[in-house]
């Protein structure tokens, strides 16, 4: 879908969350890639953190960012697989008010084009919590690239037509 260059680009504030038991700041290649994508697209990197694969820790961090009026969107990397320690989708589900099922569906479709049937092991997901977008991507740099380039780059661009997530932001808190 096209970017309408006659429309004004509206940058948003995005927090990047890396979920990993094994990665520290020095080894966070997926988080680094995601932060670079956010900035390169013209958005503001509002915050960044690395947390352990723990439902309570993840959901607590998400809730703090959702409560922060300076954060419009959270994108995480890691913890979306099938192992016992992969708890990101459960943590996100505790926080969001509404799920965005099409995000995970489209992510897996895009992943299929890159990694074939291995895409069935991904539980990438998204939702909205109190007006803040929450997106959970797998932990590999390739998956981050697929999710950003294939979905988030355009959906977080206010010029994308026929619609985008940014233009919905003022209406997310409607009752």
Predicted features by range, described:
Residues 1-175:
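Non-catalytic beta/alpha edge segments that cap or flank active sites
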